[in-house]
């Protein structure tokens, strides 16, 4: 067992993970990094799955759902960064978001009030959805909000947790690597 291997919550989540990957292909997408269910010693529960990367389109039904599984959907856009922001904001969820760009103006727009409408917005680094010390709780249909604790007054303002990676490296959450 690898230290990065973590189980999904239960067998129902494993089934949802498998169905999500099937749905990507059914809708015309491509699986770039194949996932799958891990088995053998240390994986007896049947709840361990491999991360997957899928190329999809913004109008795919599966992209509009929150799958709670280690699946990264790659969505292409063209034109100004506002087009990418529109694609990203056009879902009902709003926990976390990220953009990869070398353009500082694009990065700043993504992090501005005209940009990502998620609770966490990162530039040039992925997101785990639970950055330590950040404004946790999500936006839109994600999470239960932040009003149950010391963040009660903050409901009256729009907050984001932002990260900009200025290096040439692209570190992934929890040290995950995809050797392609």
Regions found by a protein language model. Name each.
Residues 6-9, 99:
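Glycine- and other small-residue-rich loops at beta-strand/loop junctions that grip anionic moieties
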Residues 44-180:
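Conserved C-terminal structural/oligomerization subdomain of aldehyde/semialdehyde dehydrogenase
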Residues 20-28:
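Helical element adjacent to the flavin cofactor pocket in flavoenzyme catalytic cores
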Residues 35-42, 126:
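Short, solvent-exposed loop/turn elements at beta->coil junctions and helix N-caps
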Residues 5-6, 44:
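Low-complexity basic/metal-binding stretches
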Residues 8-18:
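Short beta-strand to alpha-helix junction loop
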Residues 1-3:
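Short, small-residue-biased leader/transition segments that mark boundaries at the very start
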């Amino acid at each position: 067992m690898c230290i990065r291997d973590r189980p999904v919550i239960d067998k129902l989540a494993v089934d949802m993970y498998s169905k999500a990957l099937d749905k990507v292909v059914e809708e015309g997408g491509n699986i770039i990094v194949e996932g799958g269910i891990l088995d053998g010693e240390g994986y007896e529960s049947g709840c361990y799955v491999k991360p997957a990367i899928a190329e999809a389109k913004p109008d795919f039904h599966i992209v509009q759902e929150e799958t709670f599984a280690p699946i990264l959907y790659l969505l292409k856009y063209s034109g100004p960064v506002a087009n990418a922001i529109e694609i990203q904001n056009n879902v009902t969820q709003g926990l976390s978001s990220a953009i990869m760009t070398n353009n500082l103006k694009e990065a700043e727009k993504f992090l501005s009030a005209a940009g990502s409408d998620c609770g966490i917005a990162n530039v040039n680094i992925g997101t785990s959805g639970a950055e330590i010390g950040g404004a946790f709780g999500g936006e839109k249909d994600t999470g239960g909000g932040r009003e149950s604790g010391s963040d009660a007054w903050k409901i009256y303002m729009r907050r984001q947790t932002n990260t900009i990676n200025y290096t040439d490296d692209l570190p992934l959450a929890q040290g995950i690597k995809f050797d392609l």
